[in-house]
């Protein structure tokens, strides 16, 4: 979270771009690429080292390892172009994703959901918050947060920003969460003894232990413990505008 705080301090309090895609266009993604199972950047950290395409890397001391949870045990042959790494077994490039209710988008993406243009200083729309893709708008009906000062409710100590994402749901770096209908769209991780790491807007981090003692599954939730976990996460993702 220190890197995020430094970024917002340099960018008029705006969160970095967090669009609902894996674009690698310079200047339009806090963390570019598709790092999920089978994704082209699953074992290729190169894009994470490009400060124009992964806008937090300069605030992380150019250490791409900080995008990955050490408990994520995926390993495979390197997929990038660095001659020193070609043919070597490397860990997965990324585990972390950002709350889709947090961050900014550019006017081009806001208009098309497919291309990027203009300055990314619009709040994200939270495209999955209603359970129907692209139905939610900024603060209509669910809150989204384009600046650090926007938080509340949820309060900064309750609003999660980064999460360990399960590799089965990992694709782009924006974590999709619905606030209605008790279902998992993307999957929070279980890397820490069936617990998941979260970083919150106030700067603190914690490992939340799930009541449902197994990996999350995409789709409708039927187990009461799993629903309790979903309720906890929704309460820390967004809030309905009153």
Task: Describe each region flagged by the PLM.
Residues 1-242:
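Short, well-structured segments within or immediately adjacent to enzyme catalytic domains
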